[in-house]
Amino acid sequence: MNISDVAKKTGLTSKAIRFYEEKGLVTPPLRSENGYRTYTQKHLNELTLLRQARQVGFNLEECGELVNLFNDPRRHSADVKKRTLEKVAEIERHISELQSMRDQLLALAESCPGDDSADCPIIDNLSGCCHHKAQKPR
């Protein structure tokens, strides 16, 4: 198979395939007599694994580890499961951080009248200035 065939079958671009090759994330393809890359089913499997692993949040280094496990006949499913659960824990931490950010933003938005006034509690709060302005006695 040539690179365009592999791109169609994996859903990756030719550029992405070459990038993964340059990074050493896939087995180097053989070259035909005219210098074109020649791919096998193994390449398709590695590239599909990379695409799908990236889609669920694995970074390039982690993808490389997964490809290495894929190619290791002595691998243990426990190793793959461990990496997967570590990724789940990382995603849960990110979700928690995002929820905290959301809550902070909602609190800021609630503090702002959102009118034509130049006074903006959101800007004041984010800049650290005038945070006592709203608490001045009248």
UniProtKB/Swiss-Prot annotation:
Q: Name one GO cellular component term.
A: cytoplasm
Q: One Pfam family, short name please?
A: MerR_1
**Where primarily located?**
cytoplasm
Could you confirm whether the keyword Transcription regulation appears in this record? Answer: yes
DNA-binding region(s): which residue ranges? 4-23
Q: What happens when the gene is disrupted?
A: Loss of copper-based induction of copA. Causes a mild defect in aerobic growth on CuSO(4), strongly impairs survival during anaerobic growth on CuSO(4).
Check the record and name the Gene3D superfamilies matching this protein: 1.10.1660.10
Tell me which residues make up the HTH merR-type domain. Answer: 1-69
* Gene Ontology molecular function: any one: copper ion binding
Task: List localization entries.
Answer: Cytoplasm
Name the domain of life. Answer: Bacteria
Q: Which GO terms describe its biological process?
A: positive regulation of DNA-templated transcription
Q: Does the keyword Transcription regulation apply?
A: yes
Keywords noted in UniProt = Activator, Copper, Cytoplasm, DNA-binding, Metal-binding, Transcription, Transcription regulation
Sequence positions that bind Cu(+): 112, 120
The record describes its quaternary structure and partners as: Homodimer.
PANTHER family xref list: HTH-TYPE TRANSCRIPTIONAL REGULATOR CUER (PTHR30204:SF16), REDOX-CYCLING DRUG-SENSING TRANSCRIPTIONAL ACTIVATOR SOXR (PTHR30204)
Write out the domain note.
It contains a N-terminal DNA binding region and a C-terminal metal binding region.
Described by its record, this protein's role is as follows: Regulates the transcription of the copA and cuiD (cueO) genes. Detects cytoplasmic copper stress and activates transcription in response to increasing copper concentrations.
Protein name (record): HTH-type transcriptional regulator CueR
The organism's taxonomic lineage, starting at the top: Bacteria, Pseudomonadati, Pseudomonadota, Gammaproteobacteria, Enterobacterales
Recorded name of the encoding gene = cueR
